Amino acid sequence: MSSSKYKRVMLKISGEALSGKKGFGFDFDVTQRIAKEIKEIVDMGIEVGAVVGGGNIWRGRNGEEMDRTTADYMGMLATCINALALQDSLENIGVKTRVQTAIEMKEVAEPFIRRRAMRHLEKKRVVIFAAGTGNPYFSTDTTAALRAAEIEADAILLAKKVDGVYDKDPNKYDDAKKFDKLTYIEVLEKGLQVMDSTATSLCMDNNIPILVFGLDKPNNIKKVIMGEQIGTIVSK
């Protein structure tokens, strides 16, 4: 067993992270590395739920000339492709996994049923939640916050391409300042790019800490679980 203070976590992985340096599609070396890092914490006794974004395949802003609802549904389907890719990488290394979707597609995945998801987690299966909330106008960040509340996760691990939360884009500004700790209110008031305001508010209302870190370096998921200060913690 681990000495982590977290028993059950929700891992949110951006779709872009799966594309690595390619910027689109999949970098399977990255997908396999993420799977190995998830296996590490599963082997420590941590129960893991996961939500993957769809930005490596489709982003709503790509469809500016489209109906917003249609564009959002396309994004939801993109997350299903990513969920199946992650499931495959996990099962190839012996991690028992289930994909649950908010839009029914029973030939490829289970429908989202909270009690069933909880049972899978108790049996040490990784549960990947796909197709967002099943509704347009909600991001995968909101999905992660909602599912985290539903499965009673102790924290959200927010894996991004940057290594924490900054006051401005560190890729554009050399003087960008990184925060070690923030409150939910500070994130909302400053308009910081952590999660969108709906997701942040959900975490605040349910007292779910958000641990923001970069996926660029190996073993960061385990480091965050073990309490190493490598990113930004958002809490009360």
Swiss-Prot record:
InterPro entries: AceGlu_kinase-like_sf, Asp/Glu/Uridylate_kinase, Uridylate_kinase, Uridylate_kinase_bac. Residues 20-25 are annotated as: Involved in allosteric activation by GTP. Pathway: Pyrimidine metabolism; CTP biosynthesis via de novo pathway; UDP from UMP (UMPK route): step 1/1. It catalyses: UMP + ATP = UDP + ADP. ATP binds at K12, I13, S14, G15, G55, R59, Y166, D169. GO terms for biological process: 'de novo' CTP biosynthetic process; UDP biosynthetic process. Its main location: cytoplasm. Catalyzes the reversible phosphorylation of UMP to UDP. This is Uridylate kinase. It comes from Clostridium novyi (strain NT). The gene is pyrH.
